[in-house]
């Protein structure tokens, strides 16, 4: 028996040979099984054309041949599959080619049966499925879908076939008979009868359609009887074929069904293909819509929008129809320059017989999105810079173009990648293309994307070209000596740059506070300025202008020659007494410098003498001996030493004083201290007193001696140990160093280590203690940020000096320098404000004598700040809290730092020790950023005095006691926390201000009796003023017609009304400002600026209206023959009264507010300390007072000595005289008011000036009502006339007729006479300006404590 492989080979060879033989012989016997099936379905007429063609011109035809292969071994199946897959097609023959061989059907035995499966992609025909037994019917467990497998091979083809693409025609027709309900039931006999008859008729009629396959009735509905059915065909109907088929249906259907021929309706589905080109539409594209059908017709159309507007050929649209092979049709609509307005629904209609083919598509415009950096800066240094453009859109781009527009033309090299939708334009500009004159010129480069369909999208890139800066630096060599100043000027010819800085030769940046920078239109300038040079400034310095990655550098060498500073020269003696018959030695010592020897001379009177040099330890000492037997005695001699270095720079020491006395006056004598008479007090440097170590050590400080009896007694000692003194000298040099911020961390570490080693000396020596305080004060002024490690070193040093064992040294130190404790606290607060925690965890730093806690404010995550401090050794505790609302007003990333001290209370303000004082913590809380709004803080202290006394919450005010500092209770109060616990005191603090701040830059001490008195006067006076001014305006309104009958009276009352109105508004704004900065409402910066502006404006308006009144009087008396109209006078008056104040107040706020120095930090009034903006109010007011006084003198003189012919009418003279009275009284009052205001400016002025100033200003409104309004005789008469009864009128007439009745406020009344005698018959009182009496808390500490 042959092997399977041999059998397979012979079989395939047979297939191929048989195929080739078949292609050379008549084909009819071989293809018969295949074409018989075709003949049965489609009719004989379809086969004949093929045969005619084959027998005629031998035109190439395609045949499908079914070959059946049988074999016994199932494993052959995979071998056949593999062999067929490896064949290469086509297989060429002499007269025919085999195009493809595909396996379609596989039958395998299953018991006694044969199961036939379709290969993937093939299926049994519907006819076979309906009339054959499927595998699932044989065994439901077999895999595969229904009808993918048949039981038994069909007796006569076809086998499995490729699935046909059917066209389903949905139709309906009406039967003109009555509808019966059984037609809804698919299992009823009536339904089956109708379905069978109709399908038979439909099949007979529609089988004439090309590619007909089946027809099925799907439903019967009402409307007579409406028959719904579907016809399945493989090709589109030909025109007119449906009508013919419908006629055949009518003919083949029983007439009893009464089918209505005109009721045939139909709509096909899935037969129209709609294409949009391009897929993504950009604005400007030419868009083509294609509608393709599988049939041919001439009835096509296009429409747009929901209203189905018909589209015709035009400039915008083009419609074109194409027939392909006479079997399909494509209609195209082209839309030119598609815009956003063209977007919407588009549809095509193709009509064939009773069918309407069509589809709809919505078209949208996609914006062209181009990514590019819109601004670039390019330095003309010949380095390539790339401009990049990329489109986010996936599109068929035809090109990417670059264009430029600008004053200068700099071309680049474009490179585009259309597949990635990106383009790069590389610029390489050099100095010749952008000279210095064109530096900063901007050129617009445009990248434009062009699609294959016409759309264009562009993006502009603004490129600013900057020339490389040419730097010019100070030419002259810089050679200075220590202590001298120098500056280096660096000029750039380019004004565009990103950064300017200075470097040392080691690459260390110099702190910006040492240099300035100014930018000009055509360049820039930076100046390095050093006020006090040290040896650390010796070296090379680089001026660097950076623009992007381009650097322009200029260098300058600086030579600093050593020269001792005056403060570094140690002298002996400072002052001394000596015998006339003895020689006396003078000594000047400086730190020994190996590289420099000074020429030193001693100067006595007008003579100079060379010095002798001696090195003692680390010091170089220069001495001179004054010879004995001077001609005159006693005599006072002043001696100083003069140092000259190699650069011929010199410095002289302070004078050493020697008093020559006879021997008989000497009672005290010591070889080191010297001689002296009783009561003599002298100072010696500790270095030369022999009280500290060896003479060569750099010991600081002084010792004071007093001659008592025959012995020198040491009165006080303020010596500084050598290590601490060395640190002090380094600290003084560090704050002048160019690299101070880099050196500060190392220095603070060394300071804490040295403080620990010298702990005993610091706590026992006031001098060393004072040196540490001076060091901390110096270092706290270094403008740099403090980190946690630096703060740790600072607190370690503070812990040493605040120990209880150092309290005696503190007391002695404060007796010598009373501000040292306040200075120490101030330096701690500066360090706390400079602390920057960043993202690190806030540290808790704890020592026995100081603790620190902190928090960082995060954006969007406000939380309560609450910290507690416990000092068990001191039996003290306290906590501080700031609520979430207050923290929300802080800038993000602000640091809040609280430092607590258990012993500082006993050190601060020694005068407190003389009172009953509560021993409590001192807690200082600082914020790293400026606080714009008032800040409320609450604290709780342990109460160690529960038995008696009233606790008082206080804060440290640095400005008290001539800036020595003191405890202040302003804005702090003891509150009830609801716990009823006498062991604790709950405090709330909110800084307040008082009213006298308006004119005086300084203010009375908060909480003092003077401050309270000024507050009371201000509030009462303002209340009276507001009521009086309102009453004045009401009175003027009532008597207006009676008192304004001539122009002079009219203008006078215009001025009085405006004065009263302006002062009333000013007083109201004054109260608003007081409410803001008194803390009743949060201090809003905008509200405070507004209050300051309106107070300034309306108070100035009061004075300018007063000036208007004076000038009007002057005009009426001097220019008698010139009479201006009312409208002219009013225009001038209002321009002067409101225009000038508006200009002054607007300029003031415009100039100062951008720098945030318009108003004070703690009050709503003009700034004094920073900008002297207060002068914008005081100077105009005082000038107006002087002018009005001068006018008053002239007017009174003119009235008393009238010229002939110049006398005005009686009524005019009465008005003028009344005005002179008003000016005469009002102006002196104003002058006195602001005279006292000037007095309050003087530092330490008497409290009487504050009281008088506040009294006169607060009651101005009342004075205006009395003297400016009610004292006017015409006003009195008008009021009496308006409110008198007939009886009173009769009596008044009678009294008037006999001349014995006078109004109570008339010039001749007794009361008026008293005023006339008092004021010299000059009239009424004029308007002054109220002052805020606010206490300045700008120098207040944030340290709080508790007083009892």
Swiss-Prot record:
Changing residue 1240 to S: Exogenous ligand-mediated activation maintained, although with decreased efficacy compared to wild-type. The record marks 51-52, 223-224, 992-993 as: Cleavage. The gene is Adgrf5. Disulfide bonds join 291-348, 389-447, 490-543, 953-987, 972-989. Residues 1328-1348 are annotated as: Disordered. Residues 163-271 form the SEA domain. The modification Phosphoserine is found at residues 818, 1309. Residues 841-1005 form the GAIN-B domain. The chain crosses the membrane at residues 1020-1040, 1056-1076, 1093-1113, 1131-1151, 1176-1196, 1222-1242, 1251-1271. It comes from Mus musculus. Residues 1041-1055, 1114-1130, 1197-1221, 1272-1348 are cytoplasmic. The modification Phosphothreonine is found at residue 1302. Changing residue 1158 to A: Unresponsive to exogenous ligand-mediated activation; no effect on location at the plasma membrane. Belongs to the G-protein coupled receptor 2 family. Adhesion G-protein coupled receptor (ADGR) subfamily. Residues 953-1005 are annotated as: GPS. Residues 1-21 form the signal peptide. SUPFAM superfamilies: Family A G protein-coupled receptor-like, Immunoglobulin, SEA domain. This is Adhesion G protein-coupled receptor F5. As an adhesion G protein-coupled receptor (aGPCR) exhibits a large N-terminal extracellular domain containing highly conserved GPCR autoproteolysis-inducing (GAIN) domain. During synthesis, intracellular autoproteolytic processing of nascent chain within the GAIN domain generates a mature protein, consisting of an N-terminal fragment that is non-covalently linked to the C-terminal fragment. The mature protein is routed to the plasma membrane where the N- and C-terminal fragments remain associated, forming the holoreceptor.
């Amino acid at each position: 028996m042959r092997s399977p492989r041999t059998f397979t080979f012979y079989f395939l060879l047979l297939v191929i040979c048989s195929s080739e033989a078949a292609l050379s012989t008549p084909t009819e016997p071989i293809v018969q099984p295949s074409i018989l099936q075709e003949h049965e379905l489609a009719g004989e007429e379809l086969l004949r054309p093929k045969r005619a063609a084959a027998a005629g011109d031998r035109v190439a035809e395609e045949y499908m041949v079914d070959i059946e292969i049988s074999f016994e071994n199932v494993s052959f199946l995979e071998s056949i599959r593999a062999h067929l897959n490896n064949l290469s097609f086509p297989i060429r023959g002499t007269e025919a080619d085999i195009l493809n061989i595909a396996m379609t059907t596989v039958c395998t035995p299953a018991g006694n049966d044969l199961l036939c499966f379709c290969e993937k992609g093939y299926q049994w025909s519907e006819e076979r499925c309906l009339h054959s037994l499927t595998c699932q019917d044989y065994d439901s467990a077999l895999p595969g879908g229904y009808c993918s497998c048949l039981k038994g091979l069909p007796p006569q083809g076809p086998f499995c076939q490729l699935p046909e693409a059917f066209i389903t025609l949905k139709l309906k027709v009406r039967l003109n008979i009555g509808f019966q309900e059984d037609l809804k039931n698919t299992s009823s006999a009536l339904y089956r009868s109708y379905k069978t008859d109709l399908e038979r008729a439909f099949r007979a009629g529609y089988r004439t359609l090309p590619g007909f396959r089946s027809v099925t009735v799907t439903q019967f509905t009402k409307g007579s009887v409406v028959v719904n059915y579907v016809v399945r065909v493989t090709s589109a109907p030909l025109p007119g074929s449906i009508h013919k088929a419908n006629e055949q249906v009518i003919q083949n259907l029983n007439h009893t069904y009464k089918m209505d021929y005109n009721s045939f309706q139909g709509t096909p589905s899935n037969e129209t293909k709609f294409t949009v080109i391009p897929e993504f539409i950009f604005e400007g594209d030419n868009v083509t819509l294609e509608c393709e059908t599988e049939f041919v017709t001439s009835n096509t159309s296009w429409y747009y929008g929901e209203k189905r507007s018909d589209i015709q050929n035009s400039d915008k649209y083009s419609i074109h129809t194409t027939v392909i092979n006479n079997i399909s049709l494509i209609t195209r609509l082209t839309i030119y320059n598609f815009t956003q307005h063209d977007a919407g629904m588009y549809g095509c209609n193709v009509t064939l017989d009773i069918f309407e083919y069509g589809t709809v598509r919505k078209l949208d415009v996609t914006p062209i999105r181009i990514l590019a950096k819109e601004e670039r800066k390019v330095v003309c240094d010949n380095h390539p810079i790339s401009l990049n453009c990329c489109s986010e859109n996936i599109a068929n781009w035809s090109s990417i173009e670059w264009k430029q527009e600008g004053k200068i033309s700099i071309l680049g090299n474009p490179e585009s990648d259309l597949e990635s939708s990106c383009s790069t334009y590389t610029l390489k500009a050099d100095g010749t293309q952008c000279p210095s004159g064109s530096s900063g010129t901007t050129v617009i480069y445009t990248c434009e994307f062009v699609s294959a369909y016409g759309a264009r999208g562009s993006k502009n890139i603004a490129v600013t070209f900057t020339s490389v800066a040419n730097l010019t630096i100070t030419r002259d060599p810089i050679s200075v000596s220590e202590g001298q100043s120098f500056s280096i000027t660096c000029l750039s010819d380019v004004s565009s740059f990103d950064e300017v800085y200075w470097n040392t030769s080691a690459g260390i940046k110099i702190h910006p506070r040492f240099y300035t920078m100014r930018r000009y239109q055509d360049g820039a300038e930076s100046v390095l300025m050093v006020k006090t040079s040290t040896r650390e400034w010796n070296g090379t310095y680089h001026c660097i202008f950076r623009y992007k990655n381009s650097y322009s550098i200029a260098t300058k060498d600086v030579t600093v020659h050593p020269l001792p500073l005056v403060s570094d020269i140690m002298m002996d003696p400072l002052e001394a007494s000596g015998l006339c018959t003895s020689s006396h030695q003078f000594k000047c010592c400086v730190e020994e410098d190996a590289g420099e020897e000074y020429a030193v001379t001693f100067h006595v009177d007008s003579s100079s003498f060379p010095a002798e040099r001696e090195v003692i330890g680390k010091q170089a000492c220069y001495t001179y001996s004054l010879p004995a037997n001077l001609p005159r005695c006693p005599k006072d001699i002043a001696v100083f030493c003069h140092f000259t270095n190699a650069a011929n720079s010199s410095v002289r020491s302070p004078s050493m004083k020697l008093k020559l006395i006879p021997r008989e006056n000497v009672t005290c004598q010591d070889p080191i201290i010297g001689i002296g008479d009783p009561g003599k007090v002298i100072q010696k440097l500790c270095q030369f007193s022999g009280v500290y170590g060896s003479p060569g050590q750099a010991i600081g400080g002084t010792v004071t001696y007093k001659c008592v009896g025959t012995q020198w007694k040491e009165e006080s000692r303020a010596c500084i140990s050598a290590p601490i003194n060395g640190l002090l000298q380094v600290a003084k040099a560090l704050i002048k160093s160019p690299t101070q911020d880099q050196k500060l961390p190392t220095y603070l570490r060394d300071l804490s280590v040295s403080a620990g080693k010298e702990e005993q000396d610091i706590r026992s020596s006031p001098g060393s203690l004072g040196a540490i305080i001076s060091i901390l004060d110096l270092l706290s002024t270094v403008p740099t940020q403090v980190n946690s490690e630096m703060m740790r070193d600072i607190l370690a040093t503070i812990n040493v000096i605040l120990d209880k064992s150092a309290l005696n040294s503190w007391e002695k130190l404060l007796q010598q320098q009373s501000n040292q404790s306040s200075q120490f606290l101030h330096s701690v607060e500066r360090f706390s404000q400079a602390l920057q925690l960043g993202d690190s965890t806030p540290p808790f730093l704890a020592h026995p004598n100081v603790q620190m806690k902190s928090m960082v404010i995060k954006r969007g995550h406000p939380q309560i700040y609450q910290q507690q401090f416990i000092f068990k050794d001191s039996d003290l505790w306290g906590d501080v809290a700031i609520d979430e609302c207050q923290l929300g007003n802080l800038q993000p990333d602000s640091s809040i730092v609280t430092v607590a001290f258990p012993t500082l209370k006993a050190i601060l303000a020694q005068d407190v020790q003389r009172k009953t004082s509560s021993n409590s913590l001192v807690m200082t809380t600082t914020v790293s950023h400026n606080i714009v709004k008032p800040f409320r803080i609450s604290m709780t202290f342990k109460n160690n005095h529960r038995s008696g006394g009233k606790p008082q919450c206080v804060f440290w005010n640095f400005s008290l006691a001539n800036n020595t500092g003191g405890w202040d209770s302003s804005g702090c109060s003891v509150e009830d926390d609801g716990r009823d616990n006498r062991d604790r005191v709950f405090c709330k603090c909110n800084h307040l201000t008082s009213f006298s701040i308006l004119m005086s830059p300084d203010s009375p001490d908060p909480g003092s009796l003077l401050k309270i008195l000024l507050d009371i006067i201000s509030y009462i006076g303002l209340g009276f003023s507001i009521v009086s001014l309102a009453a004045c305006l009401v009175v003027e309104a009532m008597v207006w017609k009676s008192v304004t009958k001539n122009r002079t009276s009219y203008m006078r009352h215009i001025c009085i009304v405006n004065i009263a109105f302006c002062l009333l508004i000013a007083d109201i704004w004054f109260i608003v400002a007081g409410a803001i900065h008194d803390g009743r409402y949060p201090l809003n910066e905008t509200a405070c600026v507004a209050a300051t502006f309106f107070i300034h404006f309306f108070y100035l308006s009061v004075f300018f209206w007063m000036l208007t009144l004076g000038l009007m009087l002057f005009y009426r008396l001097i220019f008698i023959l010139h009479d201006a109209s009312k409208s002219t006078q009013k225009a001038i008056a209002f321009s002067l009264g409101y225009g000038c104040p508006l200009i002054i107040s607007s300029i003031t706020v415009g100039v100062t507010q951008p720098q945030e120095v318009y108003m004070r930090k703690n009050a709503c009034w003009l700034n004094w300390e920073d900008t002297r903006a207060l002068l914008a109010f005081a100077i105009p007011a005082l000038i107006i007072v002087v002018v009005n006084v001068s006018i008053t003198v002239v007017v009174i003189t003119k009235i008393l000595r009238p010229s002939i012919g110049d006398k005005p009418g009686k009524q005019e003279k009465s008005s003028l005289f009344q005005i002179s009275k008003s000016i005469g009284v009002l102006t002196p009052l104003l002058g006195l008011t602001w005279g006292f205001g000037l007095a309050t400016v003087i530092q330490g002025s008497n409290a009487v000036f504050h009281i008088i100033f506040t009294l006169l200003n607060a009651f101005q409104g009342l004075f205006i009502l009395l003297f400016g309004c009610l004292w006017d005789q015409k006003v009195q008469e008008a009021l009496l006339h308006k409110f008198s009864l007939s009886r009173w009128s009769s009596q008044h007439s009678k009294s008037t007729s006999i001349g014995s009745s006078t109004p109570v406020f008339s010039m001749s009344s007794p009361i008026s006479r008293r005023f006339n005698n008092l004021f010299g018959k000059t009239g009424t009182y004029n308007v002054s300006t109220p002052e805020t009496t606010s206490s300045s808390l700008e120098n207040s500490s944030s340290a709080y404590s508790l007083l009892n």
